[in-house]
Amino acid sequence: MATCIWLRSCGARRLGSTFPGCRLRPRAGGLVPASGPAPGPAQLRCYAGRLAGLSAALLRTDSFVGGRWLPAAATFPVQDPASGAALGMVADCGVREARAAVRAAYEAFCRWREVSAKERSSLLRKWYNLMIQNKDDLARIITAESGKPLKEAHGEILYSAFFLEWFSEEARRVYGDIIHTPAKDRRALVLKQPIGVAAVITPWNFPSAMITRKVGAALAAGCTVVVKPAEDTPFSALALAELASQAGIPSGVYNVIPCSRKNAKEVGEAICTDPLVSKISFTGSTTTGKILLHHAANSVKRVSMELGGLAPFIVFDSANVDQAVAGAMASKFRNTGQTCVCSNQFLVQRGIHDAFVKAFAEAMKKNLRVGNGFEEGTTQGPLINEKAVEKVEKQVNDAVSKGATVVTGGKRHQLGKNFFEPTLLCNVTQDMLCTHEETFGPLAPVIKFDTEEEAIAIANAADVGLAGYFYSQDPAQIWRVAEQLEVGMVGVNEGLISSVECPFGGVKQSGLGREGSKYGIDEYLELKYVCYGGL
């Protein structure tokens, strides 16, 4: 009992600076908000009231291994990207903690795989219900650690929870097969069995949804997981762990090992090379994905990867301009351009080019508002860090130096070092960085083209192929282009394509496998053929 109280006290001390207006003090059974004025500068205190009522149980700073909250030997700071201020100190796990988490997950797997599909389904449903009950607090955590506008954070929490709901239902639909063989005295059976422990490595841009999309499928299949969240956004993963525990998910089934950027490489290598891990699921950059593939190759592990993209957004002459602009706004500026399926280059046919650029610029000026994610009306929050801002800035400067024209935006925003103005460029050519390097920011470069063949050639020149979009009112053209685009997902007259019911993934160097949909659970299942003779 003394140990438990000490752990809670450690958590309280660490969270004393966590989230403005939500200072915590220990008490038996958990953490409660402390009284007194909100700490920190006025820039942070301006939204302190929105966090003051946050559930203390969801503000976790330790690792979650084997059903227990465990501190690490060191901690690392998590920063608010809007102000740069430290939100709190989180356990900085290393190789030792990573291996302990894998061991806990393996021991739990030996029990979890025997749990009936109906019971697994019920537990995932309880987890989903708890997410819905706590959706406001979970959304505020996302906004605090990622800068995402609160309205979008609420949307992510619902999207995230829906994966648990979906896979709670899919858990009961894992069917095998019977194959008739030429021999009359034999029967062939095909069983689907859970693959084992899955190492799950997730990004910062969707700190909740990228976890449940993977973990929901894994747990539904009968696998257990070790989650290494992005160092920028560990609080969401830890809050999910608390709710998983409350839902009755057995100890060791869901484990979380946060770590700093300094430790990320060795922790990632430790869990991906551990012989007790059978599966690796990763969302992140193509460069990191290739490193993890190398780790997986040494022991031939199953791998799912959702990597970088360079999504083309094509507007043909037959397109409805207003519809295309609405799709462009949704596709490009969600999460301030920091999504893997954001349109990266806009290919606009000559006949409609000027009308589209004019309408797009007007829509940007009218509808986009840069600000702190907690401020009502904000549509564009900060980028995750200054390095991300520098990348956008570099691409804009490169394009302008080579002849591109800034229609609107084009520079850092006065709000702070992590803010950049929503930017529209025209007169863009294919020799510019922004056309062959993923931006991950609020930059929309427009390339003028003449023929359908030219647009397809530009779009397919990339060595990645996650998503693509195009707008056309020509039925024959729609079929041709949809089939010819070398991407895993296509939006036809639609800028928002993600859905829990549909398979998410790419081709070429954008990844392996699919997540979500009825196909997502197959990534965590092995096929076993059983030949039954002597009948």
UniProtKB/Swiss-Prot annotation:
Effect caused by changing residue 382 to L: In SSADHD; 2% of activity
Transit peptide: 1-47
Cell cycle is among the record's keywords: no
Effect noted on mutating residue 409 to D: In SSADHD; <1% of activity
Pfam families hit by this protein: Aldedh
Outcome of swapping residue 93 to F: In SSADHD; 3% of activity
Domain of life: Eukaryota
EC number: 1.2.1.24
Modification sites for Phosphoserine: 499
UniProt signal peptide: none
Location of the active site: 306, 340
Residues with site note (Transition state stabilizer): 205
Function: Catalyzes one step in the degradation of the inhibitory neurotransmitter gamma-aminobutyric acid (GABA).
PANTHER family, per database record: SUCCINATE-SEMIALDEHYDE DEHYDROGENASE, MITOCHONDRIAL
Protein name in UniProt: Succinate-semialdehyde dehydrogenase, mitochondrial
Gene designation per UniProt: ALDH5A1
